[in-house]
């Protein structure tokens, strides 16, 4: 799965479920938690409204 496919998968997962932790996304997408964090940061910087709360996850 390339970066674009992974970022799209993150968006789709966040739309399906209200809140997801980075660890859950990493397991689902078979990648590292750090990669998920970088992808979420890139999505946020490009204007995608992703809310992250430490200890609670992303929505």
Model-derived features: positions:
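Short, basic/aromatic recognition patches that contact phosphate-bearing ligands
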Residues: 1-59
């Amino acid at each position: 799965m390339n970066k674009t496919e992974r970022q799209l998968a993150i968006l789709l997962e966040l739309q399906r479920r209200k809140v997801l932790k980075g660890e859950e996304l990493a397991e689902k997408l078979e990648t590292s938690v750090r990669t998920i964090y970088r992808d979420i940061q890139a999505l946020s910087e490009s204007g995608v409204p992703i809310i992250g709360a430490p200890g609670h996850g992303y929505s």
